[in-house]
From Swiss-Prot:
Its main location: cytoplasm. It comes from Haemophilus influenzae (strain ATCC 51907 / DSM 11121 / KW20 / Rd). Residues 18-37 bind DNA. PANTHER family: HTH-TYPE TRANSCRIPTIONAL REGULATOR, HTH-TYPE TRANSCRIPTIONAL REGULATOR ILVY. This is HTH-type transcriptional activator IlvY. One of its GO terms (molecular function) is transcription cis-regulatory region binding. The lineage of its organism: Bacteria, Pseudomonadati, Pseudomonadota, Gammaproteobacteria, Pasteurellales.
């Protein structure tokens, strides 16, 4: 058994998809299948239940996953300790953030870190910010730039870097939404909305609708992430509540209008988060010290 076997096993346990894991680790699904089979043969236990629809961990697989995560983290820490014998930090940090945050907030943070530690490689992954905490807890990334959750797990630490404001936006093109906005009073019950799947923007629009006493809003679509919602609003499919940073950076922001609301929308905190135990790793500790 090699440490790369543990890494592949952990990745497959997270994706539960042979094709995704194979693609992201630059191998064919058949090669991945053979690698997992060799691991199972070595252990003498079946780790995954496979069929055409899903991949699921067995009871032994769940136990081995805990072992694999611990050993993989120990291996990464040991490698870093060996590198720390040199005067300058080097190695790799895995960082996650949204597409918008990658150019609205991340450049300033990375610029300073790279100036201090030019030999450290940043492996950046972008995606739906609502996934940040899940990726941190699953040890898929070391650090994440994301909104502070309402209930921060005790195993996670958060360092605030900004307050993020939000706006309710509407299309400018003639459509059902613009027609309804011209009515007095506005029939919010018939207004089409575009929701994020989850996250702070989803929480804020749901709170706003509750305050409007709209129990069953008309949801045109539910979209993962934020960046794809602005074009949908601009094309006339409905209203949406989004972070202003997302709206301002969208190439479609000239096709939408911000609505004036009776009550301002509560902003949320944006920051860097990581698992507390990650602060024992020299690279993460150095990154965290720079923030403070």
């Amino acid at each position: 058994m090699e440490f790369t076997d543990l890494q592949i096993f952990i990745h497959l346990s997270d994706t539960k998809n042979f094709t995704k894991t194979a693609t992201q680790n630059h191998m064919s699904p058949s090669t991945l299948s053979r690698q997992i089979q060799r691991l199972e043969d070595e252990l003498g236990k079946t780790l995954f239940i496979r069929d055409n629809r899903q991949v699921k961990l067995t009871e032994y697989g769940e136990k081995f996953l805990q072992f694999a995560k611990t050993e993989w983290q120990n291996w990464q820490q040991f490698k870093q300790q060996l590198k720390d014998e040199s005067d300058e930090l080097c190695g790799e940090i895995k960082l996650f953030c949204s597409v918008t945050a990658s150019y609205s907030h991340l450049p300033h943070v990375l610029k300073e870190f790279r100036q201090r530690y030019p030999k450290v490689e940043i492996q950046l992954t972008t995606g739906d910010p609502a996934l940040a905490l899940e990726l941190i807890q699953a040890q898929q990334v070391d650090l994440a730039l994301a909104g502070k959750p309402n209930n921060l797990p005790s195993s996670v630490v958060f360092h605030k870097i900004d307050d993020i404001s939000l706006s309710l936006i509407a299309p400018r093109v003639a459509c059902l939404a613009t027609q309804l906005l011209q009515e007095k009073p506005i029939d919010w019950q018939q207004m089409p909305f575009i929701f994020p799947v989850e996250g702070h923007a989803r929480q804020r629009i749901e709170q706003w609708l509750r305050e409007k006493q709209i129990k069953h809003p008309k949801i045109y679509a539910t979209v993962a992430g934020h960046e794809g919602i602005v074009p949908m609003v601009g094309l006339g499919f409905g209203l949406a509540m989004l972070p202003d940073a997302v709206i301002d950076s969208s190439p479609m922001n000239n096709q939408i209008s911000r609505l004036n609301l009776d009550k301002p929308i509560e902003p949320f905190e944006l920051g860097i988060c990581t698992q507390k135990r990650n602060l024992e790793q020299p690279l993460v500790r150095a990154f965290w010290a720079m923030l403070e």
